[in-house]
């Protein structure tokens, strides 16, 4: 993708934006396909609250986008950090709350765990799909604020590292 930077109108942020949209589209398609299959197998019903489902999805995308921009900015600045990105990404999968519910945690651990911004979007999606049948814990304003900080910090890191990009 760096070859596109030969063109004057294309900036690094355009490439990152396209990659983020591609990831979001792929994740959305995967979620939709799995949900349709489970719906056809009568394992899930229609979502109870579409607005909460979509809000959680967008909130999760917002926080993830910001975190990805931070990782990208750090990888652009420090070559050794580039090797850690996949390790960090794979570590975040179980921490995100996809494989377990926040309600399963003891209250004192739940409070600490909810400082991680990713589970808030996942819990909102869970609440939108299952409704009152599943207890959920989330604070959308907290995750929105952390996502905003992530995005601003990520954009600053990328803009500051722009001179470190070498087009071969």
Residue ranges and their predicted role:
Residues 159-168:
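Short cytosolic juxtamembrane segments of multi-pass membrane proteins
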Residues 104-111, 130-141:
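Extracellular/periplasmic helix-loop-helix junctions in multi-pass membrane proteins
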Residues 12, 17-85, 135-144, 149-156:
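Alpha-helical transmembrane segments and their short interhelical loops
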